[in-house]
Design a protein with these regions (language model features):
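Catalytic nucleophile serine of serine hydrolases
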Residues: 26
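Patatin-like phospholipase
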Residues: 1-22, 33-267
């Protein structure tokens, strides 16, 4: 995605295209922010920091600190330029709602929305939910009143696998080049590519994978909701202290399995 954004930024500088609004979730929300800051180079620094940290610790708890560091580099009133132009999505598990944030009170509020959008349970923090209720957006918000270009990182199983398979990569230069070539092909041929397409001009293939993604998101968010409220109920049980020991062991087991699996691709 980063390579595609570099390409789009260059077209924007040449006044070949006009960007009115941007929407993103998870790492996409970070890249949208960097795009608006005209600081896409910072993404490579974030990539290196997260990769090295995961290699040492087996999780990405540092992501909150990374975003706090980014906050320090943002101009004081920058958030005003993001109101109604930057749309960040995340899930409120407590209310079972898909939230799209597009108005911000200040820069801190903006970064806080991105933290919610990037939070993957137990991987980005020690708890299931960020601030007891929020998790990753999982899908960006679509604009129905504008021509919308979708940079889809989950367009098929190949892109999903390649996204997490970074074992032999020293940096993200190759990914940047691939992203730039993909969107170059899109504009050159005016046809959907693996990653890039207009949402009003998709193939059956892209629609199938996106609808599959929606179904997975539905079940995943409801599963998290179920686990969260089951844990609340269990705390009221008389022998909760014994159950808590079991839950703690189970959490450590899940974390260990997750780390071992991801380590095959990320370290």
């Amino acid at each position: 995605m980063l390579g595609a954004l570099y390409y789009i930024k260059q077209l924007q500088c040449l006044k070949r295209i006009q960007i009115n609004k941007m929407s993103g979730c998870s790492i996409g929300s970070v890249l949208c922010l960097l795009f608006k800051l005209d600081n896409l180079d910072y993404a490579s620094q974030i990539y290196t920091t997260l990769r090295n940290y995961f290699k040492q610790h087996g999780h990405l708890y540092i992501i909150s600190n990374v975003l706090d560091d980014l906050l320090l580099s943002i101009p004081k009133h920058f958030y005003k330029t993001c109101n109604e132009t930057l749309f960040i999505s995340y899930h409120n598990i407590k209310k079972q709602k898909y939230i799209v944030k597009h108005k911000f009170k200040n820069n801190h509020d903006l970064i806080n929305a991105i933290k919610k959008s990037c939070y993957i349970p137990f991987l980005c923090g020690p708890k299931m939910l960020f601030k007891t209720q929020f998790v990753d957006g999982l899908k960006p918000y679509f604009f129905n009143d504008h021509k919308t270009l979708f940079l889809n990182l989950f367009s098929d199983y190949k892109t999903i696998f390649s996204m997490i398979n970074i074992q032999n990569e020293l940096n993200n230069s190759e990914r940047i080049i691939k992203g730039a070539l993909d969107i170059h092909t899109f504009f050159k041929t005016n046809k959907p590519t693996y990653m890039c397409y207009f949402i009003d001009n998709t193939t059956i293939y892209h629609r199938f994978f996106f609808q599959t993604r929606i179904v997975i998101i539905y079940f995943l968010t409801h599963f998290i909701f179920f686990i969260y409220y089951c844990s609340k109920f269990i705390k009221r049980i008389k022998y909760y202290q014994y159950i808590r020991i079991f839950i703690s062991i189970y959490k450590q087991f899940i974390k260990k399995i997750t780390y071992t699996y991801l380590k095959l691709f990320m370290v």
